[in-house]
Amino acid sequence: MNKANQLVINYHITEKCNYDCHYCYAKWAKPNELHRNVDEMKRVLSKLAEYFLSPNPIQQQLQYQSVRLNFAGGEPLLLKQRLIDALDFAIELGFETSIITNGHLISDEFIAKHSHKLQLLGVSYDACRYEVQKQIGRITRSGNVLSVERLQSIFKQVKRHSPSTKLKINTVVNQFNSEEDFIGVMASLQPDKWKVLRVLPVFDSIQTISDQQFESFIERHQSLVHCMSAENNDSMTNSYLMLSPDGAFFQNGNGSSGYFKSRPLLTTPIDVALAESGFDAIKFAQRYH
């Protein structure tokens, strides 16, 4: 069954980040980011709403009931009020919303004021040990990391302020954390979903891991199968509907190319840009089954 209850559009709103993860593919050589011109950003979001929230070929194919705009980065919370404004506008247009963040900038105030707006809050978390976080690059310039204790506090507060907001952890299995043990931390966090992704060699500089390393990580965490969703490289390719910071659809490629982009949505009809993007709706649906 190639059906999906919800279509997800991942809007990589900024390339800026307070971390420097070695495997990150969110690098667009500092494009002209759409959010800097609020009117243009609103035009693009409005075009997306007009197309995807009305009958269209993808909707006919997947039979989705709702569309979620997922704000990603870089680190979206670096944009502060500009992110909140984009979030509020997306809700006004009729989107469900979510954020994927490294969690470092989530304040208690942010949770109290805004967590109820989110259908889902995702936190990228690759290691519990400081040394491994440092090797991966999940560390600020001043040497700070997101501790397990702070992550637990974030989850607890979101559950209190917005019980309907689903909580997700994303973990990228890479050369540095393939031996990490997440059983204890997941038992304490109780996420609705733990997405385990194999590091994707989008650029030549990104070190891959072997099938065996990835599979043994999954096997070691079999006790978490009730919340774990594992994605190998093939299932990740062409199965995400992604918008770059400058407002074009893109897909991850491999090697030196990094990614493939459509023309900008500001000046291109959505259906044309969609055809240029290489998005595969069937592969998207398969990730949710």
Would you name each region that the model predicts?
Residues 65-67, 93-95, 117-119, 163-165, ...:
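Short, well-ordered coil/turn segments that N-cap beta-strands
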Residues 29, 103, 126, 199:
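Flexible loop residues that form catalytic
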Residues 33, 129-250, 257-288:
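Radical SAM enzyme [4Fe-4S]-AdoMet core and its adjacent flexible, acidic
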Residues 101-103, 254-257:
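Short glycine/proline-centered loop/turn elements that form peptide/ligand docking sites
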Residues 49-53, 113-117, 186-190:
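Acidic (Asp/Glu)-rich catalytic clusters
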Residues 76-79, 104-108, 173-179, 203:
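Acidic-and-aromatic substrate-binding clefts and catalytic sites of carbohydrate-active enzymes
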Residues 1-73, 77-98, 106-112:
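Conserved alpha-helical substructure of the radical SAM core
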Residues 9, 69-71, 97-99, 121-123, ...:
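Hydrophobic faces of well-ordered beta-strands that scaffold small-molecule active sites
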